[in-house]
């Protein structure tokens, strides 16, 4: 009998496969990084074929590490970096261009053109999103407008669009030989092209963007059997039964299943999601309204989201571009060599600022520098930037929801950094709680798949599987907390109006 569920987690920097048991504990994981391609300033790309090759590799690796055979896996779920855009030929399976990554800002002029009539919130009521370079719609439009011959091919119905969930699913189920062209509402709600109420593509918006609807995948629920893996390959014949965008997957994996429950994922960027139940709350404070999940035929659950572009990737930058650390975990050790930031604040607006500012004209800045500031202070300022940005989003969330946050569930790669977690509790003034399984993104996708095939009986099983690992309570006096935050807010204003 099948005693395990697998999840493919296609992220911004790597692809991995994780295998979970019935208690939601990790049995095995295999992970491979892929190249980050930076053709110009502000441009970020991935090679979709490299990612598909890595996907097959990690599925085989995880199964081998777990010492399991395919028949012991009940189902497979997919979770993915959202918004990242792939356009490919439906007959050959070849991408017409590299994947344009969510952080990429090349579509600024398209955003400005669309915002000229109706402003940044032109599509906000229907989609829950502001016009921004972040979302897939403008990226599809850029590929259609800038890659030779692509628009004509798209209009003839020869090309397909997908985010990474769709790209992995299509290839896993046969590719040009009958591959499924499907997505779920959590991913579709990040394109700027889906109506949040109907959960369908909005033909008027697609027409205004100049995107043929024939390119777009079918939108199905987040938890159902979409199809089966092609017979060739390590997971041959297994049902693919769950799809969730990475941040919604983490929300589901964290068991934030009731209105008012929230989680913050610390990854390449930070993503704070608050469950608002079946109500679509339109933000007045720079947050996104997004689909949280739709489990089979159940009602759609919505979330408010605060997206922060640069957090974990700032640590990467410190390692790769400046060489101040040799590996990401070293930053905590370096930051502990000093007691504070020495008056230095680092605003990592590498690709503008996301929530709650939505300023694509902003660029990164280190302010407050003196001769006193050393490597340790810079390391500390890098970590503190993550916590300060999180507070900005939580204040916007409190204003929109009218419900002050009482505690924060955290997950993702950076939550192993105890200095950061303590500072996060200090700057928020509420407890920060880390679960036993901190990589909840893959777990959420596994839950969605397992529910679809009856491996788990109900969402209550998810809640009962959740367990606390550690809690950090605030220790900083309120007066100091507010003084630090005021300095941060002042630093943020110094990054505006940089790009003409």
Curated annotation (Swiss-Prot):
* Chain positions recorded as ATP binding sites: 12-14, 268, 312, 316, 413
User: What's one GO-annotated cellular component?
Assistant: cytosol
Q: What reaction is this protein's catalytic activity? A: glycerol + ATP = sn-glycerol 3-phosphate + ADP + H(+)
Its EC top class is transferase
Which SUPFAM superfamilies did the record assign? Answer: Actin-like ATPase domain
Activity modulation comment: Inhibited by fructose 1,6-bisphosphate (FBP).
Q: Could you confirm whether the keyword Kinase appears in this record? A: yes
- Disulphide-bridged cysteine pairs: none
One GO biological process from the UniProt record?
A: glycerol catabolic process
The pathway where this protein functions is: Polyol metabolism; glycerol degradation via glycerol kinase pathway; sn-glycerol 3-phosphate from glycerol: step 1/1
This protein's UniProt keywords: ATP-binding, Glycerol metabolism, Kinase, Nucleotide-binding, Transferase
Q: Which residues bind ADP?
A: 12, 16, 268, 312, 413, 417
Give residues annotated as binding glycerol: 82-83, 134, 246-247
Write down the EC number.
Answer: 2.7.1.30
Q: Which residues bind sn-glycerol 3-phosphate?
A: 12, 82-83, 134, 246
Q: Show the stretches that span the lipid bilayer.
A: none
The UniProt entry's coiled-coil ranges are none
Which GO molecular function, any one, fits this protein according to its record?
glycerol kinase activity
PANTHER family to which the protein is assigned, alphabetical: GLYCEROL KINASE (PTHR10196:SF69), SUGAR KINASE (PTHR10196)
Describe the task this protein carries out.
Key enzyme in the regulation of glycerol uptake and metabolism. Catalyzes the phosphorylation of glycerol to yield sn-glycerol 3-phosphate.
HAMAP family recorded: Glycerol_kin (MF_00186)
Family listed: Belongs to the FGGY kinase family.
Q: What is this protein called?
A: Glycerol kinase
User: Which organism's genome codes for this protein?
Assistant: Saccharopolyspora erythraea (strain ATCC 11635 / DSM 40517 / JCM 4748 / NBRC 13426 / NCIMB 8594 / NRRL 2338)
């Amino acid at each position: 009998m099948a005693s395990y569920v697998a999840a493919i987690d296609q992220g911004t920097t790597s692809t991995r496969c994780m295998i979970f048991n019935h208690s939601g504990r990790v049995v095995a994981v295999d992970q491979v990084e892929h190249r980050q391609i930076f053709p110009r300033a502000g441009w970020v790309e991935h090679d979709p074929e490299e990612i598909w090759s890595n996907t097959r590799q990690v599925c085989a690796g995880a199964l081998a590490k777990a010492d399991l055979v395919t028949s012991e896996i009940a189902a497979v779920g997919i979770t993915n970096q959202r918004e990242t855009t792939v356009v490919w030929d439906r007959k050959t399976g070849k991408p017409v261009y590299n994947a344009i990554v969510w952080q990429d800002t090349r579509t600024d002029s398209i955003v400005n053109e669309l915002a000229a009539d109706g402003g940044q919130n032109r599509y906000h009521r229907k989609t829950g999103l502001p016009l921004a370079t972040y979302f897939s719609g403008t990226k599809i439009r850029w590929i259609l407008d800038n890659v030779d011959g692509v628009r004509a091919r798209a209009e003839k119905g020869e090309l397909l669009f997908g985010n990474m969930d769709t790209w992995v699913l299509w290839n896993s189920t046969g590719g040009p030989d009958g591959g499924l062209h499907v997505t779920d509402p959590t991913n579709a709600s990040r394109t700027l092209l889906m109506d949040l109420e109907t959960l369908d593509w909005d033909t008027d918006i697609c027409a205004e963007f100049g995107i043929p609807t024939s390119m777009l995948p079918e939108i199905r629920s987040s938890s159902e059997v979409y199809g089966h893996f092609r017979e060739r390959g390590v997971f041959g014949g297994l049902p693919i039964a769950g799809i969730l965008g990475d941040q919604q997957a983490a929300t589901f994996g964290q068991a934030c299943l009731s209105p008012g429950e929230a989680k913050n994922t610390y990854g390449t960027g930070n993503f704070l999601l608050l469950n608002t139940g079946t109500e679509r709350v339109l933000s007045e404070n720079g947050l996104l309204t997004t689909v949280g999940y739709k489990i089979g035929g159940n009602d759609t659950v919505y979330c408010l989201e605060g997206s922060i572009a640069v957090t974990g990737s700032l640590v990467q930058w410190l390692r790769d571009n400046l060489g101040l650390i040799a590996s990401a975990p070293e930053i905590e050790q370096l930051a502990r060599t000093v007691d504070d930031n020495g008056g230095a604040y680092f605003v990592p607006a590498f690709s503008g600022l996301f929530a709650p500012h939505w300023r694509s004209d902003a660029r990164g800045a280190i302010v407050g520098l003196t001769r006193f500031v050393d490597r340790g202070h810079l390391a500390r300022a890098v970590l503190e930037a993550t916590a300060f940005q999180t507070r900005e989003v939580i204040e916007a969330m409190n204003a929109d929801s009218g419900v002050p946050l009482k505690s924060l569930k955290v997950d993702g790669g950076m939550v192993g950094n105890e200095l950061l977690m303590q500072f996060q509790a200090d700057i928020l003034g509420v407890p920060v709680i880390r679960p036993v399984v901190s990589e909840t993104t893959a777990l959420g996708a596994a839950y969605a798949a397992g529910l679809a095939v009856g491996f788990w009986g109900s969402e209550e099983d998810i809640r009962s599987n959740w367990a606390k690992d550690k809690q950090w309570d605030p220790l900083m006096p309120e007066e100091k907390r507010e003084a630090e935050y005021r300095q941060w807010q002042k630093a943020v204003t110094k990054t505006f109006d940089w790009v003409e």
